[in-house]
């Protein structure tokens, strides 16, 4: 049976144990993109096409480019192993965010400026 895992900011963990920062623009404003890759018998299907579309979409949205294939392949292989999909079928979701930002709420009091 496969296990839902996540890799966020350089750390592996279960999807439930890792957290996105609350000020991440993908979380706050849906300012991000994703690709879902079919894993069949431990092999990512159409990976080059998914990664090209991921990169093209980031450029279209004016975002920084996501990591390239040579940086992602070891992580993808590690994810397949960790989620026990080496001889199984499943899905891998790649998310890319514009990053963190601060929503400022101002009033007359300078003390009332908050980053959420």
PLM features per residue range, with description:
Residues 1-107:
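Conserved alpha/beta cores of soluble small-molecule-handling proteins
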